[in-house]
Amino acid sequence: MKWTDAQLIAEELYDRNPDLDPKTVRFTDLHKWICELENFDDDPNKSNESILEAILLKWLDEFE
């Protein structure tokens, strides 16, 4: 997975944390968790606030 795979990343995060409300997650934690995903293989330094926000919004869709 790459940073551009927001939907896939969001689904993985939801599957790992189905009871965690994404609205309570800090971007620093989100970044760390994404980089720790087994299938994630992108450069950790290539993320930015808009990418993390897009992933968080997709995760919120999964959560609700």
UniProtKB/Swiss-Prot annotation:
Which domain of life does the UniProt lineage start with? Bacteria
Q: Which InterPro entries match?
A: ISC_FeS_clus_asmbl_IscsX, IscX-like_sf
Q: Which SUPFAM superfamilies match?
A: IscX-like (SSF140319)
GO CC terms of this entry: cytosol
GO terms for MF: ferrous iron binding
Its GO biological process annotations read: iron-sulfur cluster assembly
Entry-linked PANTHER family: PROTEIN ISCX
Family statement drawn from the similarity comment of this UniProt entry: Belongs to the IscX family.
Briefly, what is this protein's role?
May function as iron donor in the assembly of iron-sulfur clusters.
Protein name per Swiss-Prot or TrEMBL: Protein IscX
> Taxonomic lineage per UniProt?
Bacteria, Pseudomonadati, Pseudomonadota, Gammaproteobacteria, Pasteurellales
Gene name on record?
A: iscX
